[in-house]
């Protein structure tokens, strides 16, 4: 056969249907196969088209307001506002200038001057024997001058004398020591921080207008831009009032205001006590003959202290006329009318009583000579230089607190201005209305009470309005889809970001990213309303003292202060001019009886005689025997007064007379109105003690010359020696009482002297921190005149030399007549040194010795101890609450946050739970402080501290002249 060649395989047939299960049992399941290797991932399919944008989710519910976060730490304190300037205290009404002494009136015509004999040494009093019929003995030789009697007791101050005419203002006084500040008051609760204002330029110090009487308060000036004082703390307790601070430069002094009434001391001398009966006559002593009128006595005690005048050069004495013929001495005529009353000087400390010497036998009067023609009146001399400065006195003790004065006028409140750029602070506005002060109760000011309990805490302020949204940030680039991250911890919600505008198509939902950092804090909201005022905190540290603002207008005059006790006596002033004759005193005891004579007819006034030339000193004659006592004669009629005689040459000074009796105590005078303040004056230098002059020998009286015509006034001649005593003439008949002469012309006023420096201040309480004094503001209009203050104590300024008295009128002739009643005692002289208290002699009127020379001015007494510190004044009223500052301006919006990068779109997760409220953002910058509130009114003035103890008495002044016979 043939070879079979296989053909190609045919196609396989269709798969057969499964056969029926075999009859055999089912096999066991085989072990699991090993896992196959994972297949490699297929290629990524193409990215599907983006799905439609999802709908914006509904706005979530507004979160409930979170609990207010804990109060953050206080923000940095803004610059401390300058301390509110306390309402300037009303300028103290400066004590009016002491009214300069009015021009001293010319002394009234002196009553006929008794002829002073040289006092003999005091002998033991003898019994007055009956006057025998023997002839009159010749005058004995002048005995040596008696020892100076101890100073008499100082008369108590009489009622004030009439107010002298206002003098020109004094020169500036010395700058007083700067008063120490009172204790620091507790700091009030701090108000909103004020914008610190630049200190305004000080206003130029205007020239002070004329002071005059204080006018009504002027209209308050327009309120300047408020500076930046913080709210003033509650006023501290006023410290003890310090001495006046240094006076700022003041304009030229205005014209003098009304002169205040002179305070005590001063006043007319009290009536002379009734002279006791004459003591028994002593044994015949060294009593000289009664000579012609001796030299003029020393000037009377100084008048009320005026402004020190310049010491005048003495005017030239007139040329002596020819010697008059000797006349017989008559009995002293009645005292002339009193001249213009001099202002009373300060009383000195009483000296101890001196021994009273026994009276010598009285000489008999001679017949009066014929009167000469009146002489021409001399011209006033040039003013002298001021005297040395006296020692500083101690401060007087403070009196009780006075009733507070009426409240000042209410100033208009300023309008609330908008906060502008920082400008210079304007002048302080007028003080607000002050409540009336209740009357002061009796007793002294108590100590300040303990601090009160703290007040309630203020409620928290309301939440401020949120600031504006920031500008939207730019949209970020779309990121790739990331793998889902782990769910982060829920962080605090950040602040809402700005709402974007015109965002592009949303990216795919990214997986939640990690919580971003907290956003920047939003701007600070407006300040909430202030809570209730908390309790006053403890006093804070004293801030830096701000510049003192310009001085505001003076406030109304304060209530009068309590009258202080009299300070220590100042140094003795220079010898004042001779006082006018005093009022007629009580009638003295009857003198020794004279021979009875017929009543004389009224004599015609004789022509005035010129003063005689001084005779040569004669030898002293032996003492004559005592003359017999004559029977009392009738009192003659009053004779007509003769014309004034020419001024005689001055004789040597006589010895010091006995002290005058103490004057009666007068009621205190009314307080004077406070005058405008005077500028400070220069401090004078204290002069040294001058040598004490020796007492010259008593001259003997020469016979009077015949009357001559009055000559022209020439240059002053030297004092001639006293003439020898002439032989006594026979007893003249008692003439009629002369008519009282008219008072002389008033002398010219001296120039005002410089005021003395102010005394040292008393101790002051602890001082608060004080800043530098700012320049003084212009002087405001004068305030209304307050009630008159009590007279303060007199400062211890140096007393200037008195202005030169006008030339005295020509001396009248001695008129005949019965002995005049004793005149009132002269005003007490300055305090002399305390002499040793001698044994008290028997009382009896001693003979008036001739006036001695003025003693040298004693040195200034030692300064008294410093006064105790005054008590703390009562707490001032709390100032009204300052105006709340305006809400600060809203701070600027914070910068927009940097945009975050777009995260990959993730599947939208479920809404998470609402997060807790976020922590409070850090506080924004403080807004600008509002304008400060007005300054509260000043508290009431503290009471003046008690005065220190009285210093030791000053040095002795020159002795006063002897009283009238």
Curated annotation (Swiss-Prot):
Annotated positions of the Phosphoserine modification: 98, 569
Residue ranges, compositional bias (Gly residues): 303-312
Family matches, as Pfam families: Collagen
5-hydroxylysine carried by residues: 92, 256, 323, 533, 644, 811, 869, 881
PTM comment: Contains mostly 4-hydroxyproline. Proline residues at the third position of the tripeptide repeating unit (G-X-Y) are hydroxylated in some or all of the chains. Contains 3-hydroxyproline at a few sites. This modification occurs on the first proline residue in the sequence motif Gly-Pro-Hyp, where Hyp is 4-hydroxyproline.
Residues that carry a glycan: 92, 881
Gene Ontology, cellular component aspect: extracellular matrix; extracellular space
Modified residues (4-hydroxyproline): 18, 21, 23, 32, 35, 38, 53, 68, 74, 83, 89, 116, 119, 125, 139, 160, 169, 172, 199, 202, 214, 220, 229, 235, 238, 253, 262, 265, 269, 278, 293, 299, 308, 314, 326, 332, 338, 347, 350, 359, 368, 374, 386, 395, 404, 407, 425, 442, 448, 454, 460, 466, 472, 484, 493, 506, 512, 521, 539, 554, 560, 581, 587, 590, 599, 605, 623, 632, 641, 653, 659, 668, 677, 680, 716, 725, 743, 752, 755, 761, 776, 782, 788, 796, 802, 819, 822, 825, 896, 899, 917, 932, 938, 953, 956, 959, 962, 965
Keywords noted in UniProt: Extinct organism protein, Extracellular matrix, Glycoprotein, Hydroxylation, Phosphoprotein, Secreted
Function: Type I collagen is a member of group I collagen (fibrillar forming collagen).
Entry protein name: Collagen alpha-1(I) chain
Organism in which the protein naturally occurs: Acratocnus sp. (strain SLP-2019) (Ground sloth)
């Amino acid at each position: 056969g043939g070879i079979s060649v296989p053909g190609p395989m045919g196609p396989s047939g269709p798969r057969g249907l499964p056969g029926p299960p075999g009859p055999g049992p089912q096999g066991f399941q085989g072990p699991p196969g090993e896992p196959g290797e994972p297949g490699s991932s297929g290629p990524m399919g193409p990215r599907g088209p983006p799905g439609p944008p999802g709908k914006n989710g509904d706005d979530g519910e507004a979160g409930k307001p979170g609990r207010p976060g804990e109060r953050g730490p206080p923000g940095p304190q803004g610059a401390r506002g300058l301390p509110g300037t306390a309402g300037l205290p009303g300028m103290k009404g400066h004590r009016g200038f002491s009214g300069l002494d009015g021009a001293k009136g010319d002394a009234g015509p002196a009553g006929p001057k008794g002829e002073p004999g040289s006092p003999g040494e005091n002998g033991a009093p003898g019994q007055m024997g009956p006057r025998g019929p023997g002839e009159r003995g010749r005058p004995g030789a002048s005995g040596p001058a008696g020892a100076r009697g101890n100073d008499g007791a100082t008369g108590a101050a009489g009622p004030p004398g009439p107010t002298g005419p206002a003098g020109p203002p004094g020169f500036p006084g010395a700058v007083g020591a700067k008063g120490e500040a009172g204790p620091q008051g507790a700091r009030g609760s701090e108000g909103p921080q004020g914008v610190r204002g630049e200190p305004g330029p000080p206003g130029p110090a205007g020239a002070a207008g004329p002071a005059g009487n204080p006018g009504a308060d002027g209209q308050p000036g327009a309120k300047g831009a408020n500076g930046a004082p913080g709210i003033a703390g509650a006023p501290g307790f006023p410290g003890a009032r310090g001495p006046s601070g240094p006076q700022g430069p003041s304009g030229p002094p205005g014209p003098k205001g009304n002169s205040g009434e002179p305070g005590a001391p001063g006043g007319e001398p009290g009536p002379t006590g009734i002279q006791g009966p004459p003591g028994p006559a002593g044994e015949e002593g060294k009593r000289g003959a009664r000579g012609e009128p001796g030299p003029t006595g020393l000037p009377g005690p100084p008048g009320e202290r005026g402004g020190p005048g310049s010491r005048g050069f003495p005017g030239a004495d007139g040329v002596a006329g020819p010697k008059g013929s000797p006349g017989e001495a008559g009995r002293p005529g009645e005292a002339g009318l009193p001249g213009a009353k001099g202002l009373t000087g300060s009383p000195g400390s009483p000296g101890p009583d001196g021994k009273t010497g026994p009276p010598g036998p009285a000489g008999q009067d001679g017949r009066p000579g014929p009167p000469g023609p009146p002489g021409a009146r001399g011209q006033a001399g040039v003013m002298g230089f001021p005297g040395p400065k006296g020692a500083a006195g101690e401060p007087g003790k403070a009196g009780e607190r006075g009733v507070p004065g009426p409240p000042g006028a209410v100033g208009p409140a300023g309008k609330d201005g908008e906060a502008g750029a920082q400008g210079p602070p304007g002048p302080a506005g007028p003080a607000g209305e002050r409540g009336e002060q209740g009357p002061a109760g009796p007793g002294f000011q108590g100590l300040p009470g303990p601090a009160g309990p703290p007040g309630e805490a203020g409620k928290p302020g309301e939440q401020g309005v949120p600031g504006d949204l920031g500008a939207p940030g730019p949209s970020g680039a779309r990121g790739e889809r990331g793998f889902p991250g782990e769910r982060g911890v829920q962080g605090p919600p950040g602040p809402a970001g700005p709402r974007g505008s015109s965002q592009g198509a949303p990216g795919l939902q990214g997986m939640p990213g990690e919580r971003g950092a907290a956003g920047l804090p939003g701007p600070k909201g407006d300040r909430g309303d202030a809570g209730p005022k908390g309790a006053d905190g403890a006093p804070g540290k004293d801030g830096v003292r701000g510049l003192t603002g310009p001085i505001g207008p003076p406030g109304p005059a304060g209530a009068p202060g309590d009258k202080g006790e009299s300070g220590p006596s100042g140094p003795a002033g220079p010898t004042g001019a001779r006082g006018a004759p005093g009022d007629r005193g009580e009638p003295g005891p009857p003198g020794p009886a004279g021979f009875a004579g017929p009543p004389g007819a009224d004599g015609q006034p004789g022509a005035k005689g010129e003063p005689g030339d001084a005779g040569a000193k004669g030898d002293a004659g032996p003492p004559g025997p005592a003359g017999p006592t004559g029977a009392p004669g009738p009192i003659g009629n009053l004779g007509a007064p003769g014309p004034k005689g020419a001024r005689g040459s001055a004789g040597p000074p006589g010895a010091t007379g006995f002290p005058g009796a103490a004057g009666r105590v007068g009621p205190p005078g009314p307080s004077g109105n406070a005058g405008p303040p005077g500028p400070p004056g220069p401090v004078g230098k204290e002069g040294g003690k001058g040598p004490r002059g020796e007492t010259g020998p008593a001259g003997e009286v020469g016979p009077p010359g015949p009357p001559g015509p009055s000559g022209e006034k020439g240059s002053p001649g030297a004092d001639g020696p006293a003439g020898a005593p002439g032989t006594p003439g026979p007893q003249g008949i008692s003439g009629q009482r002369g008519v009282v002469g008219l008072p002389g012309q008033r002398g010219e006023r001296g120039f005002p002297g410089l005021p003395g420096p102010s005394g040292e201040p008393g101790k002051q309480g602890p001082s608060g921190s004080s800043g530098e004094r700012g320049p003084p503001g212009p002087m405001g209009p004068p305030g209304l005149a307050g009630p008159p203050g009590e007279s303060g104590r007199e400062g211890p300024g140096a007393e200037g030399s008195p202005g030169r008295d006008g030339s005295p009128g020509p001396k009248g002739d001695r008129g005949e007549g019965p002995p005049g009643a004793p005149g009132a005692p002269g005003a007490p002289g300055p305090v002399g040194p305390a002499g040793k208290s001698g044994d008290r002699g028997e009382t009896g009127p001693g003979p008036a010795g001739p006036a001695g020379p003025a003693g040298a001015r004693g040195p200034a007494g030692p300064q008294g101890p410093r006064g105790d510190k005054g008590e703390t004044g009562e707490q001032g009223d709390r100032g009204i609450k300052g105006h709340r500052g305006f809400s600060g301006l809203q701070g600027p919006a914070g910068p927009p946050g940097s945009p975050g990068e777009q995260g990959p779109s993730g599947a939208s997760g479920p809404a998470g739970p609402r997060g807790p409220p976020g922590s409070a953002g850090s506080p924004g910058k403080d807004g600008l402080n509002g304008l400060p509130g007005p300054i509260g009114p000043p508290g009431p003035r503290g009471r003046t501290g008690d005065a220190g103890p009285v210093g030791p008495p000053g040095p002795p002044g020159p002795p006063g002249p002897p009283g009238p016979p």
